[in-house]
Amino acid sequence: MSKAEIEKEPLNLSQLDLFEEIEKLKKELNAVVLAHYYQEPDIQDVADVLGDSLQLAREAQKTDAEVIVFAGVHFMAETAKILNPNKQVLLPDLEAGCSLADSCPPNLFRHFKAQHPDAIVISYINCSAEIKALSDIICTSSNAMHLVEQIPKEQKIIFAPDKNLGGYLMKKIGREMILWQGSCHVHEIFSEKKLIGLKVRYPGAEVLAHPECESVVLRHADFIGSTKAMLDYSVASDKKEFIVVTESGLIHEMQKRSPKKLFVPAPSTQETCACNECPHMRLNTLEKLYLCMKNRTPEITMSEDLRLAALKPIERMLELSK
């Protein structure tokens, strides 16, 4: 069945029906649903594993399921396929890309890398399989600092593709790196002025921010960390109010873990409140999740040569971050 035919397929299923059908398909296919914190709440609730990029990569590596359904964006599903060549990996919507991954075209990065032949390449996991294949080590926002700190000080490092995460690491660790100038549109659009206004409105609130944000925003944060780190911090903190400076999907799990606490999404520079939602992540819906499992498509595929080349830096990451 083609993508167009699948999209036209009539669905007369309620939300509850979809939940039930997805659970049935999990058993029939021996499938596991992995979902990122930035997915819509319904998908988060039906997922077998909910996590950030590092958690989901680890789960993809160890799962016994025959089919991996990845509710996230394309590079995440690619990573699952790289780690599981003999398993079917499904993505609810193949158009669910990533502005950060798109900001680092392989042909341009290959030329950039050639200009610094004595540097090793550490690439943020938010990149294509082709960029992973050009890298020495992959990192996530959870383990980036730990991995960079393990590299000898005299060794030059190219850090790609996120300039904001790279700049944050340089400041925290105190070493220079050669940065590729890529960025995430969602994390770059948060408004410093509006954030200051929220801090005035909620004077007792702690500001939790993702390191993909710009430095002018990060300087107002009480805590900076990965999505999982922000979630864990909000659970452990004695504070009752938080301003959350990342994709607003994370707030769903924060609220579930701490129902008596208040979580306020940070505002963007745009007037619409939807700007702190990743448009790529939100292409996946509960209906598309059901249909991709029912029809076992769209499926992630790649050449074995590319998979093996991209596997090495991912395995290096998993080895160094144990």
Swiss-Prot record:
Coiled coil: none annotated. One of its GO terms (biological process) is 'de novo' NAD biosynthetic process from L-aspartate. It is an enzyme of class 2 (transferase). Pathway: Cofactor biosynthesis; NAD(+) biosynthesis; quinolinate from iminoaspartate: step 1/1. The lineage of its organism: Bacteria, Pseudomonadati, Chlorobiota, Chlorobiia, Chlorobiales. Binds 1 [4Fe-4S] cluster per subunit. Belongs to the quinolinate synthase family. Type 2 subfamily. This is Quinolinate synthase. It catalyses: iminosuccinate + dihydroxyacetone phosphate = quinolinate + phosphate + 2 H2O + H(+). It comes from Chloroherpeton thalassium (strain ATCC 35110 / GB-78). It is found in: Cytoplasm. Its EC number is 2.5.1.72. GO terms for molecular function: 4 iron, 4 sulfur cluster binding; metal ion binding; quinolinate synthetase A activity. The keyword Transcription regulation does not apply. The gene is nadA. It holds the Pfam family NadA. GO terms for cellular component: cytosol. Its cofactor is [4Fe-4S] cluster.
